[in-house]
């Protein structure tokens, strides 16, 4: 029962994160990428190189939404249709980018 309770509490916190993410940034609904960014970044909720949220080694893409992450000089970011492309040192430049 303890496990079930913690799963349902995590799920409700993710739902509330989704509604808050969709209310800022570029004005579009952020969907699952922003949630993965805030929950899976491993410290701080602003893309730290994990899960499609801006690669600190200058890798393939940033989320292009509210959690762009720092990224390297080659981190151009595809954006996945959720916001502006991130160029250079700062991911997408949304309200959660570091």
Curated annotation (Swiss-Prot):
Biased composition (Basic residues): 73-88
Origin superkingdom: Eukaryota
Segments of this protein annotated with the region Disordered: 1-29, 60-98
Biological processes annotated in GO: culmination involved in sorocarp development; slug development involved in sorocarp development; sorocarp development
Signal peptide, first to last residue: none
Residue spans of biased composition, Gly residues class: 60-72, 89-98
Family recorded in the similarity comment: Belongs to the hssA/B family.
Protein name according to UniProt: HssA/B-like protein 33
Species of the source: Dictyostelium discoideum (Social amoeba)
């Amino acid at each position: 029962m303890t496990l079930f309770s913690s799963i349902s509490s995590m799920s409700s916190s993710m739902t509330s994160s989704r509604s808050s993410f969709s209310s800022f940034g570029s004005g579009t609904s952020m969907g699952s990428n922003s949630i993965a960014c805030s929950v899976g970044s491993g410290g701080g909720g602003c893309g730290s190189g994990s899960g499609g949220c801006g690669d600190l080694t200058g890798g393939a893409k940033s989320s292009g939404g509210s959690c762009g992450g720092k990224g390297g000089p080659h981190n151009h970011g595809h954006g996945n249709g959720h916001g502006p492309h991130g160029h250079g040192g700062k991911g997408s430049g949304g309200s959660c980018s570091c």
